[in-house]
Amino acid sequence: MLRIITGTAKGKKLKTLEGEATRPTSERIKEAVFSAIQFDIEDRRVLDLFAGSGQMGLESLSRGAASVMFIDSAREAIEIVKENAKTTGFSDKCKYLVSDYRNYIRKASGREGFDLVFIDPPYAMKSSIDAAKRLLEAGLLRAGAIVVLESGEDEIDLSELSSFEVIKSTHYGKKSFINILLYKEKEE
């Protein structure tokens, strides 16, 4: 059972999609991620790409984030996120969209950016790097944005993301690599 770890919604239980379609981030990994970014959450605009149950975005709201945009290509996932937002009392700070990440980024290009982004695609997709590059190219990352990439069994090649500084890169068990990156806007 997923739950909010700390903050204003501490202990609230979250629903998740049944079956193998989604793979929620484990509580151990979630705790490690939020421990690493704890001072970079309050009043931030958050993007939860590949939202699944929405637990990463909702945990951010519980810890003081201003708002979260949840994107998932599965309508069922977004419906679960909406239920979880209602359970935690954060519905008014949430926006939701059923969309493929590429389409969302293309359509959102040039709009107001995000301060904190969670990119956790299904492991088979191997699209963490592609999503981060597209967000950067579309101007959807604010200077100093934190990007959390979760990937499967293989470490991902971060050399394509030269505009980012690696804050933390950790392997959890046999199936999860977490990379926490800081976007450093290039000076003109």
Language model segments and positions:
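Class I S-adenosyl-L-methionine-dependent methyltransferase catalytic core
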Residues: M1-E188
